[in-house]
Each structure stands twice: as C-alpha cells, then as structure tokens.
Amino acid sequence: VRYVIIGAGAVGGTIGVRLGETGHDVTLVARGAHLDAIRRRGLTLRRPDGDTTWRGPATDGPGTGPLPADTVLVLTVKSQDTDAALAAWADAPVVGGGTAAQRLPLFTAQNGVANEPAALRLFADVHGICVWLPATHLEPGVVVANGYPHPGMLHLGRFPSGADDIDRSVAADLTAAGFVAPVRADVMRWKYGKLLANLGNGLQALLGRDVPDDLRERVRAEGEAVLAAAGIPHTDRAEEAAERGDLVGHRPVGGAERAGGSTWQSLARGAGSAEADHLNGEVVLLGRLHGVPTPANAAVQLGVRRALRDRVPAGEFPLAELAALLG
C-alpha cells in the first residue's frame, strides 16, 4: 500500500513520518515554506522519546503521472481547506484507468463532521478517522508530537457506516507504526463525540489557557443539545476516557508542553483561516436547522473570524470583547 498524506501538518506529518519509519511508501503533500523545508531537509518529527527526520517525496499536488492503483489517500488538511484538496485530487488519473475519485480509498483524518459528506460527493470510497493525536505544527519542516506512549488514537471505519478490509489493512499499518487504531462500524459516532470535545478549541485560540470553565461547558452543552435535537448519536466523555485509558497521554517534548490545539496553532502561525466555522459553526448550523439556540458557539465562531481578520495573536483576544459577542 502506498500512502499519500494530503496535508503534512501536525496530524498528517505525524502519521506520515510514523508510516514512513515502518517502511511504507509515503508521499507528503504540503505547500509554501513548509513544503520547501521538507524538500530541502526532510520533515523532522520531535517527540518525547527523541527526534527523527523523514526524507522522502513531497509535493503540492497530484502531478501529471498516474497514481498507483494501490494508493490510499489520507486527507489531513483543516476542514476549511477540504473542498480545494478534494477538487485537486479527485480527477487524478490512476494506473489502469479511471480517476482517484472513482478507484482509490480516501480517509479523512480531520476534526469536524462535514468533511466526509463533502468527500462522498466526489469520491466513491470514503472512510472516516476520528483523530485523538496531540501534535503541533508551527515551524516549517517541523512537527512536534506529544502523544505518549502511543502518538495517537485513530478510530477508523467506512462513511457513513460499516467497516471493510481496507479499514482493517490501514488499521494494521497504523498499529505497526505505533498508533492505537480501532476499527469501528460507527466511526461517525466517535467523530461527533470528538466534535463536542473540539468546541473548546476556538475558546483556547481566543483566550489562551485561561478559559472560564463555565464558558467551556456552555459551548459543549449547546453542542449536546443540538445533537439530541437532530437525533445524532455520539460518544460521551466517559466512554472516550475509558477507550483512551493511559494509551495516549501528553508528555513534554524538549522540556515544553504542547502549546495549544489546532485552532490556536492556526492563529499562532498567522494562517489566515481556522476551522471554527466547521466546529462551532457545525453546532450553529444544526441549531438553526432544528430550532435550538446556540449563542455561545456563534460568539466563538464570530470571535475567531474577527481574530483572523484583525490578526489578533493567539490567546490575546479580549475576554470583554468575547463577552460582548455573547450578549
């Protein structure tokens, strides 16, 4: 199996390097200064038990030659970049005829729950991955992975439901690469549970580590309410904690704890976009569809957009301004 990791950031970089270390044919897809750095000196994965540098093929797109028929595509870009990535790869030719969208399995190792339906519009064979993987990408050519003793837990299964041999094959490869990789026929139930956990990402990006507990619980409560109204099943915190146990903890790397989650990292890098529209915004969307008020999530969504627009540094959005958005 050949893996193409579309988005070699925190999650994609960790998965790609670990698969490459275990002998798999891996191609990393990146852009800008990060791609330049990977091409020049490889991708360095910093972790609690030491650093390693992967050197292999890196690209910014599918190119002109056909993809091998045994290729597995793993989509790891942020949700706001999904449509562009899908469009770029869907029509890539495959050895033996047909296109990537027609013939190749696509795995979505991303936060949020909107990526899988978007992928299924173009790709015939879509598989979801629920990602619990504490990692950070702030510097070109470098990813810091704090997960220990395993780098992450990756539940995977077919979208919208079920599981098949390709799930089991990819899970075996991920397990050999050090991950905990359960195959689940209800992977979206896990992804909706992870969505609830990710609703605090925007708060952390705005306020840093000093997020009021009541505000964090408020955005989650709104999320639980809209999922209940929509009849969407999800895992709860107790089930998730029991599943992870002590398999994926956090350890310092180079004496430093993980700085912040995925949305915080987007603001810290000055990325110009963040995934709050697909996290808090998903709750807002479901609330509007099912008549459930979601003012806290709407405020976080708007706050992140404002922080991006005004180039507010990560963690430095005024609490008073967020309170005003909350009304």
Model-predicted regions and their roles:
Residues 2, 25, 105, 125, ...:
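Residues at the starts of beta-strands that form the adenosine-phosphate
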Residues 24, 43, 124, 179, ...:
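Short phosphate-binding/catalytic loops that engage adenosine nucleotides
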Residues 111-200:
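Rossmann-fold dinucleotide-binding core
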Residues 52-143:
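Rossmann-like NAD(P)(H) cofactor-binding subdomain of soluble oxidoreductases
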Residues 187-227, 250-259:
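Active-site-proximal catalytic alpha-helix in oxidoreductases
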Residues 1-51:
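NAD(P)+-binding Rossmann beta1-loop-alpha1 motif at the extreme N-terminus of oxidoreductases
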Residues 93-100, 143-158, 202-209, 260-268:
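Helix-loop-beta segment of a Rossmann-like dinucleotide-binding subdomain
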Residues 217-327:
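NAD(P)-dependent Rossmann-like dehydrogenase/reductase catalytic/cofactor-binding core
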